[in-house]
Amino acid sequence: MRYWYKAFEFLKLKHSYIFYKTPTNITYWWNFGVLSLYFLIIQVLTGVFLAMFYDPSILYAFSSIMFINNEIYYGWWIRGLHANGASFFFLCVYFHMFRGLYYSSFLYPRQLLWKSGVIIFLLMVVTAFLGYVLPWGQMSFRGAMVITSLLSSIPLIGNDIVFLLWGGFTIEDATLHRFYALHFLLPFILLFLSIIHISLLHETGSTNPLGIPSMYEIIPFTPYFILKDVLSILIFLVFILYINYTNPDMLGHTLNYQMANFLVTPPHIVPEWYLLFFYAILRSIPNKLLGFIAMVLSIVVLLVIPYIMKNSIIRSGSFRPCHKLFFWIFLVICILLAWIGGIPVIEPYLTTGRILSILYFVNILILFPLGIFIDKILYDIYIIKNRK
């Protein structure tokens, strides 16, 4: 409770940002946390603008998007910034999470910091799915049908949950109103949780590539690391503005530029690229309920990492060869799952997706703890040899 109490001490935030002591050896990999917050703010600001013109009804939702693109002054630019900003937001968060995993940023005393980040990520996925449905294109509608129907597999209460979510016996205006309201609300909750996340970070202090707490090799956050953050933000801003001006629809699916049609089903339903990983796990399991559980567990399992890897003597992955090996294997598994999620459900990709889904959980629950054990043995051998 002490950490949560201090996390709400908002009056200390200004002092914390200016005089926060930061290790001198942290690299640009540590900038993705700030970049994630930056793109979250962009999403909120552009989302508020789009909310002024969006009509959450199955008859006019798609038309209102076209109206924003074609009739509102610079509406196409703001909507492109919102759509592409979501991709950049997830990209930065993924880099941020994998960096934390590689350098063991979840170890004591940062367990609560890691868990708050996982909760933020879970809400991000939900928010992104809700936003994906709102344009009411062909892919949006079918994606909403597939994902919301999964809830019906929950025993006893599944059908009631789906009925409550849909607002009826099928997806209709009430569904879009619900999704619209939740999609507008959740980013503000994400901002609130992000403030807590940052406060927890400033309470425990930042890690560094060496994984060794330092009481002397530290400098104030301002102005040194502010300049690094600003440089990173400017670089990413150039990239997103270039995409937004040259090809704002580059990251969108072609079928989502067709209005939703209840009578036509696309041959291959895919979500946005940043959700393909979860979609691959979902469809790899033939049972609807088990697939839904596996998809949720793929995020929830990240909460147990601080406990199953708490016995690590060496923190940084740079000095743990087995952890480093299993980390890169894990990264390759995640990338392959995302690739499988964008491919039609045919052999051999279906079997490959099932194998990779199993390996994902095996890597987290077995290989990572095993790596700690092996690295400890290697460390003991090294100590014994040097004593001689």
Where on the chain are the PLM-derived regions?
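Membrane-embedded and interfacial regions of multi-pass energy-transducing membrane proteins
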Residues: 1-388
